[in-house]
């Protein structure tokens, strides 16, 4: 559909998903209780090691010091990215009551970010509620190779994401 609609001459120019970034941030007061469960939850969902993220700036109002651990993240590419993307479309998004309301003026055409407020929607974590109940929301960023907004929306509509 993309080839017919946008008249691509080369297969390299066809827009596709580049990578998916999953990130969980923790508050400074909660860091000791939630750091190990957040890392473990991402590893259970994706079967991949997570990396710790550090704060780049200090903020005295939030009691954050520069260089302290904030949370953890995983970057997905290639097969694992598509596996997670289809799992997200087929399993997780139908469970969410809210639909995505997207403003065409504020969205960037290269990436799309949203958050899942309850991480317990994943089937791998449902049975272990007592271990993962204190985890904050999951930030998901999907990065594409689209050149304009029309390609971006058409790409996600072909995946039936919107």
Feature map (PLM): residue ranges:
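Ribosome-associated RNA-binding proteins
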Residues: 1-162
